[in-house]
């Protein structure tokens, strides 16, 4: 709930999946079209994410890039990977230990909406940060 409060009004949705927390960042607020550099206007939001990740430091962080199905599979796969790495790199620059993070591009393989409409394609273009507790073995 601290995370929700921190990210209120940023355009990022926060959902819980079991013990994991998923931050969904729509690409229209995070990146320019077909680009992998984080928009400077999105830095304050990522700074807020970093503050929370530093506080909850017994977690593993998966940064997952996703695209819609427009264009070639290879291009989308590559773009989603670069976007995930871009977000992970920014968080690393904010003091998040890179060893806690993985960045993976999934291209169009995990849609959350239909690619038949622009609204659906827009939902599919996203970066998700999944935060999972480190379990003691």
Report each predicted region and the residues it spans.
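Periplasmic peptidoglycan-binding/anchoring modules of Gram-negative envelope and division proteins
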Residues: 4-11, 30-65, 89-93, 122, ...
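Periplasmic OmpA-like peptidoglycan-binding domain that tethers envelope proteins to the cell wall
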Residues: 64-136
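Short low-complexity stretches enriched in small and charged residues
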Residues: 18-21, 57-58, 82-87
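Membrane-engaging insertion elements
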Residues: 1-21
């Amino acid at each position: 709930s601290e995370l929700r409060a921190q990210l209120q009004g940023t355009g990022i949705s926060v959902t819980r999946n079991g013990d994991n927390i998923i931050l969904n960042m729509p690409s229209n607020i995070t990146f320019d079209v077909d680009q992998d550099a984080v928009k400077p206007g999105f830095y304050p939001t990522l700074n807020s994410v970093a503050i929370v990740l530093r506080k909850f430091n017994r977690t593993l962080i998966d940064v997952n890039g996703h695209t819609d199905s427009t264009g070639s599979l290879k291009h989308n796969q590559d773009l989603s990977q670069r976007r995930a790495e871009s977000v992970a790199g920014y968080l690393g620059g904010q003091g998040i230990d890179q060893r806690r993070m993985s960045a993976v591009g999934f291209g169009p393989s995990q849609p959350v909406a239909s690619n038949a409409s622009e609204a659906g394609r827009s939902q599919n273009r996203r970066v998700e940060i999944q935060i999972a507790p480190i379990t003691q073995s």
